[in-house]
Amino acid sequence: RVSNLTIHPLRNIIDLRYVG
């Protein structure tokens, strides 16, 4: 989710938590 990083960096962190 590279595009998400640029739009919502916080959202990307949450996604990483879900994967982990």
UniProtKB/Swiss-Prot annotation:
Q: Name one GO biological process term.
A: proteolysis
Q: Which residues are glycosylated?
A: 4
- Give the transmembrane ranges: none
Any one GO CC term of the record: extracellular region
Question: Does the record bear Hydrolase in its keywords?
Answer: yes
EC number assigned by the record = 3.4.23.-
Can you provide one Gene Ontology molecular function annotated for this UniProt record? aspartic-type endopeptidase activity
Q: Please describe the organ and tissue distribution of this protein's expression.
A: Highly expressed in the placenta between day 60 and day 100 of gestation.
Localization recorded for this chain is:
Secreted, Extracellular space
Task: Give the record's keywords alphabetically.
Answer: Aspartyl protease, Glycoprotein, Hydrolase, Protease, Secreted
Misc: On the 2D-gel the determined pI of this protein is: 4.6, its MW determined on 1D-gel is: 55 kDa.
Write out the similarity annotation: Belongs to the peptidase A1 family.
What is the protein named? Pregnancy-associated glycoprotein 55h
Q: Which organism is it from?
A: Ovis aries (Sheep)
Q: What is the lineage of its organism?
A: Eukaryota, Metazoa, Chordata, Craniata, Vertebrata
